[in-house]
């Protein structure tokens, strides 16, 4: 019996990738909503640790496949755009160090205040101050992230996060 070789059109690959994405998103990402103050703080610490890794792939896994972001004046949709955005961000923001702080929460939302420090290509240090509003799906993935951020130039001796 001769073996048959099947050649699938590119559209098949699209469907396989989407099915794989849907299967991955079905995994739970604890802690899950509804949040308590304790579980909201756990979620915040997990986010801080991931962002301080400066690994765009690792960070992106905390978000839904179709996550919606506003970061300053940029609108970002989906994990692929998140990875591209973070790769670009951390290429410019050297020696990045972040600290997040619990502000408030409801059942599936968390509000965070944060500060981070970084150096630009010229060696100038900055401290960024901001607030984030997060909304999670039932599986514990962040579906929406809205961040307002302001930067202040600082001297190296003024750094908090050494």
Report residues per predicted region:
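Residues at secondary-structure transition points
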Residues: 8-9, 53, 84, 136
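A solvent-exposed, acidic/Ser-Thr-rich amphipathic alpha-helical stretch
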Residues: 39-42, 56-109
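Residue-identity detector for glycine
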Residues: 2-3
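Short, Lys/Arg-enriched N-terminal segments with co-localized hydrophobic residues
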Residues: 6-25
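Intrinsically disordered, low-complexity regulatory regions of eukaryotic regulatory proteins
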Residues: 14-15, 46, 130
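Short, low-complexity N-terminal intrinsically disordered segments enriched in polar/charged residues
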Residues: 20-65
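A beta-strand edge to alpha-helix "cap/lid" segment located at domain peripheries
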Residues: 25-35, 84-162
